Amino acid sequence: MRGAFYIAIALLIVRSRTATGNAKSDVSRPYVVATGGESTKATPKRYLRGGLALSATNEERMDATVLSKDAKALATEGEDWLRLSLGPVGHSQTPQLKRKFDSLSAIDESSPSKKLATPDRAFTRRFRAEDPQLPKYSKIHQTFLNIPHMPHKISLTEAVLMYRMVNWKNGSSPTKQKSAEALLRLVERTSADDLERALGPTSVRLASQKKIRDEYFKNLTTMYARVHAFCHANPAECTNESTHSPLERKMKAPPDIVLFPLFNR
């Protein structure tokens, strides 16, 4: 009896596999599961999904992943990219997926000396001695320190920013939005120590952060207005010698010709 039982089980397994092989379908097409059919009548039954009698073949069909054409293309590109990453490539055509990935990776590799930095770190860095323009910046700083009626003693960072702004080709006027945005970026990136130096320790301790930065922005606006007026009155002191600089153009402009009347009335 035991031998006959094992033989029956083996026959059932063989017939189940045969039916599975005959009933293979293209999984790339949407599939509607049927609870029975000529190819599944003799296959083992399992009671699944709310008590419906489903064959083992149909269960495998239901568990199969249905891939769309876009998913197939993406999988193919992924396999190509893995082959390129893990081993030598037999073709010269780079898959689209690898090209996209490499273009993203190459953004930072093109300049390995540049490191990612927070806005604070980028804007509060000090001008080091190896900077070739440091002597020029120091001279400009000393010039701006002599401008009267400044709200506070201008720092090297503030002086360099305003020196660059006053030489802009367009938008260098203190009333322009471009100038206001540049000063606002400086306010947002100024450290607490620099705010205390500019406004004084008492003002910083008693006021809120918003009031502190608003006050600092007001000071910068006043300072730049005076720097702008000074530089346009003395363009030789502030020009960066660029042909686009309004100060340089002002220096090289021909003098105004004064026409005297021929006859006195």
Swiss-Prot record:
Subcellular location: Secreted; Host nucleus
Signal peptide: 1-19
Motif RxLR-dEER per UniProt: ranges: 46-61
Record's comment on post-translational modification: N-glycosylated. The putative N-glycosylation site at position 240 is essential for cell death-inducing activity.
Glycosylation positions in this chain: N170, N219, N240
Transmembrane as UniProt keyword: no
Record comment regarding domains: The RxLR-dEER motif acts to carry the protein into the host cell cytoplasm through binding to cell surface phosphatidylinositol-3-phosphate.
Outcome reported for the amino acid change (mutating N240A): Impairs host cell death-inducing activity
Superkingdom to which the source organism belongs: Eukaryota
UniProt keyword annotations, A-Z: Glycoprotein, Host nucleus, Secreted, Signal, Virulence
Organism: Plasmopara viticola (Downy mildew of grapevine)
Induction field: Expression is up-regulated at the earlier infection stages.
Gene name of this polypeptide: RxLR16
One Gene Ontology cellular component: extracellular region
Chain's role: Effector that acts as an elicitor that induces cell death and promotes ROS accumulation in Nicotian benthamiana. RxLR16-triggered cell death is dependent on SGT1, HSP90 and RAR1, but independent of the somatic embryogenesis receptor-like kinase SERK3/BAK1, indicating that it acts independently of the detection of cell surface pattern recognition receptors. Enhances the expressional levels of defense-associated genes involved in the salicylic acid-, jasmonate acid-, and ethylene-mediated signal transduction, resulting in disease resistance.
Primary residence: secreted
Protein name: Secreted RxLR effector protein 16
UniProt record similarity statement: Belongs to the RxLR effector family.
